[in-house]
């Protein structure tokens, strides 16, 4: 009975082990392939052995014991009073199976230990991989945050630079306004300083500073050398003199050390100032490069404006020539009309002469006209047929005069219609020329104002850059300014100022008048010009409104 229980337990344990091995075979097949195969083979062998032992035990049992489930060792030993006491002994045939079961359990325990070790290694490997992945993710997050912080700092610095520049610009504007208000009532005589760029002034100032600092450094180095030489000589003299006390030597040595430290500190400060000046020089060089680029851009814009002005002048000359051609055509049309008028007058006079020449006398000569060929033939026929009867001749002449009159009236009506058409054409050409003149006057006015605005902007920009360069590093050691001489403008001679003002005003007036005259006399001819250009000119006129206030 005990053997059967043990066999069942062994079978149950083996089934659990095999099931567990089947569950983890998919995950551990790559790393523990050979060990898994060995363990599986051993498990199958144990299973086969257990089945064979059971079968042999059943076959070799005596017939009297085949029906009972209890073993026969404890049947003869009458120890207890109950039936449960009979199954406490082990049969001799069961000893071998117990040994095999114990050996198999030991092997299974060893395998479990090895599996525990392997699982420990796997756990450590997964933990290390997780830590590496965590470090990578944290590093990526740190880099992203660091880049974002750098971008924010850069944006903040840019905003700070913009604010600083705007404040400097406002300060320069306020100073310029105060200077202009001050110069309205007083005349200030200052030292004539050569007009240089702001960058050159700054570089000269910094070079002067560098030279001064270098001279100071040289002087301090010379003093240091002198102190060192003097100290060494003194030490030698003190060593020779045995009567000199040691306390004085120590005091002087301390004083020299303090002086040396002070000089070294001054030298370090001067070196720091030199580095700062070098940085300022580099910044000024960058500003100089940017100013040069801005000047090149301004020069390019001015060149473009000059090219556009030349192109507009060429178009203006072309329009002038076209309008002159139109005027010449109009003059030719007028001459043709005059010729037609004189012709009509001559025809009327000839008609009147014919009517006067017609009379009731038979021997009156026939009237001839130069315009109608059939009248000449009639006169020739009438001259050839003088012997005809008088009533027939009179009737024929009356018919010819009536026909001539009708032809002349039709010609006069056609000429009048042509005259009306020509008048309408001339009026239309005149209106078109006026419209084109006005549009071109507007264009030239806008172009001139924009050109003046660009010139004023360049001038103000350069003046403000100079003011900024002077105000950026204000110091009393840079430029020695003379005392200002303030004079009231009322004490100045009125002749020079009046002459200067009148000459400048006359010059401006003459320029404006000449421009207006040129614009009025310059007729424009592009009759087929589209109205899109006028619509494009309107925003430019709106933009040029502040330029008019500036002028």
Swiss-Prot record:
| Coiled-coil annotated residue ranges, if any | 203-315, 405-439
Q: Where are the transmembrane segments?
A: none
Gene that this sequence comes from = C10orf67
For the region Disordered, what residue ranges are annotated? 354-389, 519-551
Keyword check for Metal-binding, yes or no: no
Q: In which organism is this protein found?
A: Homo sapiens (Human)
**Where found in the cell?**
Mitochondrion
Q: Where is the composition biased (Polar residues)?
A: 366-384, 541-551
The family database entries (Pfam families) matched by this protein are listed as: DUF4709, DUF4724
- Show the GO cellular component annotation of the record: mitochondrion
Give the main location. Answer: mitochondrion
Keyword vocabulary terms for this entry = Coiled coil, Mitochondrion, Transit peptide
Q: What is this protein called?
A: Uncharacterized protein C10orf67, mitochondrial
- InterPro entries attached to this UniProt entry: C10orf67-like (IPR040119), DUF4709 (IPR031651), DUF4724 (IPR031711)
> Which residue interval is the transit peptide?
1-36
Quaternary data:
Interacts with NOD2.
């Amino acid at each position: 009975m005990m053997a059967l229980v043990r066999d069942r337990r062994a079978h149950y344990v083996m089934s659990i082990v095999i099931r567990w091995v089947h569950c983890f075979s998919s995950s551990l097949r790559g790393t523990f392939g050979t060990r898994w195969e060995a363990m599986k083979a051993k498990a199958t062998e144990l299973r086969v052995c257990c089945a064979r032992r059971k079968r042999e035990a059943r076959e070799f049992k005596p017939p009297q014991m085949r029906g009972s489930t209890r073993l026969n060792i404890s049947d003869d030993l009458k120890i207890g009073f109950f039936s449960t006491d009979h199954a406490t002994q082990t049969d001799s045939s069961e000893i071998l199976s117990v040994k095999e079961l114990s050996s198999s359990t030991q092997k299974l325990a060893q395998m479990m230990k090895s599996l525990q070790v392997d699982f420990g290694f796997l756990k450590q490997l997964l933990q290390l991989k997780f830590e590496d992945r965590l470090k990578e993710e944290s590093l990526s997050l740190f880099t992203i945050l660091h880049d974002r912080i750098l971008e924010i700092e850069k944006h903040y610095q840019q905003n700070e630079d913009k604010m600083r520049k705007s404040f400097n610009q406002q300060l320069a504007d306020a100073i310029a306004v105060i200077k202009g208000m001050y110069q309205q009532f007083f005349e200030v005589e200052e030292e004539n300083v050569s007009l240089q760029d702001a960058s050159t002034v700054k570089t000269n100032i910094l070079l002067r500073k560098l030279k001064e600092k270098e001279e100071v450094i040289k002087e301090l180095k010379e003093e240091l050398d002198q102190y060192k030489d003097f100290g060494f000589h003194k030490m030698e003299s003190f060593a020779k003199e045995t009567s000199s006390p040691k306390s004085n030597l120590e005091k002087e040595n301390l004083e020299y050390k303090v002086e040396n430290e002070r000089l070294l500190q001054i030298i370090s400060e001067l070196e720091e100032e030199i580095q700062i000046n070098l940085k300022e020089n580099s910044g000024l060089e960058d500003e100089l490069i940017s100013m040069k680029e801005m000047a090149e851009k301004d020069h390019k814009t001015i060149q473009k404006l000059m090219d556009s002005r030349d192109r507009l002048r060429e178009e203006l000359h072309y329009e002038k020539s076209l309008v002159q051609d139109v005027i010449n055509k109009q003059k030719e049309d007028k001459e043709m009309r005059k010729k037609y008028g004189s012709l009509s007058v001559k025809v009327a006079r000839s008609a009147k002469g014919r009517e006067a020449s017609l009379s009731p006398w038979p021997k009156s000569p026939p009237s001839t006209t130069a315009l109608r060929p059939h009248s000449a033939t009639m006169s020739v026929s009438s001259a050839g047929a003088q012997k005809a009867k008088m009533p027939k001749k009179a009737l024929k002449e009356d018919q010819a005069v009536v026909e001539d009159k009708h032809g002349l009236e039709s010609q006069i009506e056609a000429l009048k219609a042509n005259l009306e058409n020509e008048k309408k054409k001339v009026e239309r050409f005149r209106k078109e020329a006026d419209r084109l003149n006005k549009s071109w006057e507007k264009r030239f006015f806008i172009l001139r104002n924009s050109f003046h605005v660009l010139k004023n902007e360049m001038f103000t920009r350069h003046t403000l850059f100079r003011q900024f360069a002077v105000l950026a590093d204000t110091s009393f050691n840079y430029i020695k300014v003379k005392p200002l001489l303030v004079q009231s403008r009322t004490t100045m001679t009125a002749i020079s100022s009046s002459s200067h003002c009148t000459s400048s005003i006359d010059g401006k007036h003459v320029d404006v008048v000449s421009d207006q005259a040129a614009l009025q006399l310059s007729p424009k001819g592009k009759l087929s010009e589209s109205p899109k250009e006028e619509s494009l000119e309107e925003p430019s006129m709106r933009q040029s409104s502040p330029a008019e206030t500036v002028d």
